[in-house]
Swiss-Prot record:
Both phosphorylation and phosphorolysis are carried out by the same active site and suggest a common mechanism for both reactions. It comes from Xanthomonas oryzae pv. oryzae (strain KACC10331 / KXO85). This is HPr kinase/phosphorylase. GO terms for biological process: regulation of carbohydrate metabolic process. PANTHER family: HPR KINASE_PHOSPHORYLASE, PROTEIN YJDM-RELATED. The Walker A ATP-binding motif also binds Pi and PPi. Belongs to the HPrK/P family. It catalyses: [HPr protein]-L-serine + ATP = [HPr protein]-O-phospho-L-serine + ADP + H(+); [HPr protein]-O-phospho-L-serine + phosphate + H(+) = [HPr protein]-L-serine + diphosphate. Homohexamer. It comes from the Bacteria. Residues 206-215 are annotated as: Important for the catalytic mechanism of both phosphorylation and dephosphorylation.
Length: 316
């Protein structure tokens, strides 16, 4: 999913938090940056003024403006030209410093957004870098019900009619929490972290066949809903056409594997849906098993080791 942000969107989203004022280049509000590929040579999203390797948002603090003032007229004009020519998303001046007239005029002429904030330079840098990184991070929407079970994020997937929503409802009644139903959105906010959230349209809602749309917050209380959670496990529900006949190894280890989501392989456990099986209990057990495995505890491996030791002791 391609993501982008315009200068106007960034300004509106950060105006109150950073007390931003738009002082020049208002016609450049439609300037846009898009999520780029993982390229070490691409420009930084935000940073202090850099003419050689320009940032997408150039921050001018006390030292940067003092450096501009130290240049002679010709060097100053050439430097401002270089700043403008690379077409940054915006320029941001910290500490409510006055905007130099020539810089403001160049911003207006080139339609380069220029903002002023009372925040210090490093505060602007931290806020803008974090916000841009989150906004432009790779993201994907998956079909399923995303829940918090035993404090970890679990995505329940399966074909239509496999019982995902009914399972989610049972888990809610057992004290677990809903993040998103039907279309949770996952963002890769770090090399090994997928953050799952709910689209605004579906917030607090769970659709169950026969009951329609339920408001989980109203039915179970505020604590039954979670704003976001990191994805750690996928539980996939499958409906076998015939009685499954797992191999001996699968009987020991279960039907586990992984699913590739963005750049990560997420652990996956498959649970067959059959009459008489308590899927809520099985999903809780699968989650507990995953937690144990992350701690290096594998019951199947322990049993295999015990069995091997027993055979060795009994072998003459």
């Amino acid at each position: 999913m391609n993501t982008s942000i315009t200068a106007r969107e960034l300004f509106d989203q950060q105006r109150d938090k950073l007390a931003l004022r738009w002082v020049a280049g208002q016609k450049g509000e439609h300037r846009e940056i898009q999520a780029g590929s993982n390229n070490a040579r691409r420009p930084s999203l935000a940073g202090y003024l850099n003419v050689i390797y320009p940032n997408k948002v150039q921050i001018l603090g006390t030292e940067e403006l003092a450096w501009l003032d130290s240049l002679d007229a010709r060097q100053r004009w050439e430097t401002i030209e270089k700043i403008i020519q690379v077409q940054p998303l915006a320029l941001a001046i910290s500490k409510n410093q006055s905007c130099p007239e020539d810089l403001g005029a160049a911003a207006d002429e080139s339609n380069t957004p220029l903002w002023i904030s009372p925040k210090r330079g490093h505060e602007l840098l931290n806020h803008l870098s974090y916000h841009l990184a989150r906004t432009l991070a790779p993201r994907v929407t998956l079909h399923g019900v995303f829940m918090e079970i035993y404090s970890i994020g679990v995505l329940i997937t399966g074909e239509a009619g496999s019982g995902k929503s009914e399972l989610a409802l049972e888990l809610l009644s057992r004290g677990h929490r809903l993040v998103a139903d039907d279309a949770p959105e996952f963002t890769q906010i770090a090399p090994d972290v997928l953050d799952g959230t709910c689209p605004e349209l579906l917030q607090d809602l769970l659709e169950v066949r026969g009951l329609g749309v339920l408001n989980v917050r109203d039915m179970f209380g505020d604590t039954a809903v979670k704003k976001n959670k990191y994805l750690r496990l996928i539980v996939h529900l499958t409906r076998p056409m015939t009685e499954p006949t797992p191999s001996g190894y699968e009987r020991l280890t279960g039907d586990s594997g992984s699913r590739h989501v963005l750049d990560l392989d997420v652990p996956l456990i498959t649970l067959p849906v059959m009459p008489g099986r308590n899927l809520a209990v099985l999903t809780e057990a699968a989650t507990r098993l995953h937690i144990l495995r992350t701690k290096g505890i594998d019951p199947a491996a322990m049993f295999i080791a015990r069995h091997s030791n027993l055979l060795e002791r009994r072998t003459p």
